[in-house]
Regions:
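Interaction-mediating elements
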Residues: 1-131
């Protein structure tokens, strides 16, 4: 069960939706999450009231104002190869669905344990189910 936050500059509702679909489809393709397991927060930033700051050339990647930050929180257990495949697939689909160049797709993954999730009712469902 990943929880995804997407922050994008100059992103209207259509672009945010396309980016959300790209990330979700990549999660399904690359690491096998169920298609109905979608929990996302999508935020567009206009550069005036809501801003994103970034280094335009950090590590030799040349970013511009089409930058998208994707933060994925998920349970631990994926291999380095699965994560690399996920990064590649997100970049591919962000370009295909939203026209965002791969150089502008910045992804982070944070992992946690089953006890760290409550899907409602004040219960840690994964922990109680032994998942």
């Amino acid at each position: 069960m990943p929880f995804v936050r997407i922050d994008a500059l100059r992103a209207d509702e259509k672009r945010l939706d396309a980016l959300g679909r790209a990330v979700h489809d990549a999660l399904v393709d690359a690491i096998g999450i169920p298609p109905d397991d979608r929990f996302q927060v999508l935020t567009g930033h206009d550069g005036t009231h809501r801003m994103i700051r970034y280094d335009a050339g950090y590590l030799g990647v040349h970013r511009d104002d089409d930058l998208v930050f994707v933060a994925i929180t998920m349970r631990s257990g994926r291999t380095a190869e699965q994560k690399q495949a996920l990064y590649r697939r997100i970049a591919e689909l962000a370009e295909e669905y939203a026209g965002t160049e791969p150089r502008n797709v910045f992804v982070t993954i944070s992992e946690n344990q089953p006890i760290d999730w409550s899907f409602g009712d004040g219960v840690a469902q994964y922990a109680e189910a032994g998942l």
